[in-house]
Amino acid sequence: MLLFDIKRYAINDGPGIRITIFMKGCPLACVWCHNPEGISPRAEKLYTRKKCIGCGACVDVCPTGALTLTEAGIVTNRSLCRTCGRCAEVCPTLAMEMSGREYSIDEVMREIEKETVFMDRSEGGVTFCGGEPLSRPSDLVALLDRCGALGIHRAVDTTLFASPDTVRSVMERTDLFLVDLKHMDSGSHRRFTGVPNERILSNLRMIAEAGMDFLIRIPLIEGVNADEENISRSATFLASLPWERKVVNLLPYHDIGKGK
């Protein structure tokens, strides 16, 4: 499977101290996305201009001549780049980085098991996010099963934009869903994320009616969904769900993803 990050000692991705596994690939393309490197399901080369010192080491090792050093920094000829990662390997300042590394199920489990002492003492666990973890259902299910066999608390941070069958399969193996709710109007949802919201709302109602534990996270973004009408419609919809926890986290917008 392709991951683009593993975050240890996470305290905002579910109860206790957790390890968060970032799975690459997402069917949404939110205009405010703070992890745009997680959208593509393939490995990518990332370049951060402000980190670049203009040493040219990446240019020297590129096997296809795809890189050029200019006054504006490194320019990549996308038609020549094979995403081999040689440039990232030699970059001394991490201006060039690869987003996406292949892991086996066993490799991911070894990383998770390293953190069990912190999980046990804090009643924490593992959180799978992305990207969109439901876009890699077979990998996600395998990891959830392995974690469940070890008694590790399992959370899935998701948009719920997936087939009902995928959601049901994950439901059987998950202790907590962290659900991102973007917009109640389907047209606006498509405009700002690239997909409509009917499937998301239907899946959310399904997990609620199944008695699953979940909490809602709403990023409030001026000009997108922070208006009174959308907030009121969100509250009305959530109040209609058979939902014991009834926790909604309102997340202030930040522009950390602009530089990515």
Where are these regions (language model features)?
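Extended, non-globular alpha-helical segments
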Residues: Y47-I53, G100-E115
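N-terminal pre-triad scaffold of radical SAM enzymes
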Residues: F4-A57, I74-T83
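Structured beta->alpha junctions
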Residues: A10, K51, L80, G100, ...
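Fold-independent oxyanion-binding glycine-rich loops
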Residues: I6, K24, P36, R78-S79, ...
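Short helix/strand-capping connector loops at secondary-structure junctions
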Residues: G259-K260
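Conserved AdoMet/S-adenosylmethionine-binding subsite of the radical SAM
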Residues: D106-I256
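Iron-sulfur cluster-binding cysteine motifs and their immediate structural context
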Residues: V31-G38, A57-V75, R86-E102
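Hydrophobic packing within well-folded, soluble alpha/beta domains
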Residues: C30, C52, C58, C62, ...
